[in-house]
């Protein structure tokens, strides 16, 4: 089947999620427009061992060509995102988290947004985190530079142009994403914090537009296991991967003074928490992780971004 024949490719990158992934796929199969359109579901699965029930469900769907089930041998979020982009057979690709409940009109609204906004390369849908409800917000960016749109409320009910992204409910023109190299694989797996913001900043700098579409809504379950939570808590860890992405983003895209302020703010903010107030012995542990993260990010920022090679970008 050619890209022209497919209307939409849904890509779900999953890590250490079993039954919640099966539930998410089940919700998608029952959405408006799914049965009436040429839509494919691609699961880029980084889970080594599924529960027996999940393994059976995924295998059955794969054998019946309900899903395309791609297995990867190790977790690497941006690598998996790029794999999904390359495998997609539609001109439009919709990335979704593996632990969501989608609104019944999710697919229709993403497709409609691209039809209404042909100059837009990326559409970000509404994301309701646990306990959140939709909220009318007349948003105006209060900050510029690295922090521009960092505080954008993705539960807003007002559509607008944005300069940030959340990959858990993001549709894009495949050609646009490929032209800019996809997602940067310098981000340390599996956390890869700020990779969406880096992607958005890179596209906006190149003249691309990103539209926030509130009608394309999901409820994010924020499952307590799997995903980026598989590496434990950032509060008491000296590991660098929790902070690497934030520093790397700043070093890649910030002007010198903006970058310095951003990095220093993060360094001190990370220990100004209720947890560290009651567990002060973890402050030096956390700072050790932040120092390691900064110097790893500094080294990585001096290298070319690890994007999809030109030779692999089949538009």
Predicted regions and their residues:
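Acidic donor-binding loop at a coil-to-helix junction in glycosyltransferase catalytic cores
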Residues: 189-199
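Short, well-formed alpha-helical segments that are part of the catalytic scaffolds
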Residues: 17-31
